[in-house]
């Protein structure tokens, strides 16, 4: 099938430099409305990938996001949110970006063009057959990502990808390709815009669904979140109040004693059950 680089096609808008601020903002918002529809069409593939990942993570497997530039930064961002949000170790979801941590703030020349570097970085993490590699690249042509996915697949490791072009080279290396076709960017070729928004949405969907299925959420609450600041301590305290009907002071003391909402609630209920016996 033909590889069409939609991400490089001309914008549907012209003379951007002659538009008013309001016109530019309204145009961008109009284009952004298309992103959610494109993501919705990709849900069957997202579901397929997530369904394959869940049992792997339950057996100790990890998820590696790999990308360059905006795509790499979004992968690192999503991975970095898993420990504080769900109380998981930082080794469960790992974001790798071409050029390393320096590339999070500054471009690293030619880093994404190295076909072998991605796999070398995965080897440093002792990647194994229970793990999953998810490549992220709007174009679907990033050598750093493609090389890592190709070698991972040769070693029997599950591969997925998120791209904004159909039938891309990256998609051919994925067991489950997620193609989210958002159309030409408002600024021609600026894939940090709609493509980046779509990537962020899909990464949210993947990681959140997996964490819910792993039992890291109860009801609709982040009962395993890390208590890293006063706002989160207050949030956790109010969760306990809602669940156990304690006053604020007792709920907060219980939370701080046990370190998480889930542990605090379980300990309180065990204690009460023992008392009643």
Swiss-Prot record:
Q: Does the keyword Lyase apply?
A: yes
Q: What InterPro entries does this protein map onto?
A: Etherase_MurQ (IPR005488), Glucokinase_regulatory_CS (IPR005486), MURQ/GCKR (IPR040190), SIS_dom (IPR001347), SIS_dom_sf (IPR046348)
GO annotation, biological process: amino sugar catabolic process; N-acetylmuramic acid catabolic process; peptidoglycan turnover
Q: In which pathway does it act?
A: Amino-sugar metabolism; N-acetylmuramate degradation
Name any one Pfam family assigned in the record.
GKRP_SIS_N
Q: Where is the SIS domain?
A: 53-216
Q: Which SUPFAM superfamilies match?
A: SIS domain
Domain of life, source organism:
Bacteria
Disulfide bonds listed in the record:
none
What does the UniProt record say this protein does? Specifically catalyzes the cleavage of the D-lactyl ether substituent of MurNAc 6-phosphate, producing GlcNAc 6-phosphate and D-lactate.
Please give the family membership noted in the entry.
Answer: Belongs to the GCKR-like family. MurNAc-6-P etherase subfamily.
Q: What is this protein called?
A: N-acetylmuramic acid 6-phosphate etherase
Query: What is the taxonomic lineage of the source species?
Result: Bacteria, Pseudomonadati, Bacteroidota, Bacteroidia, Bacteroidales
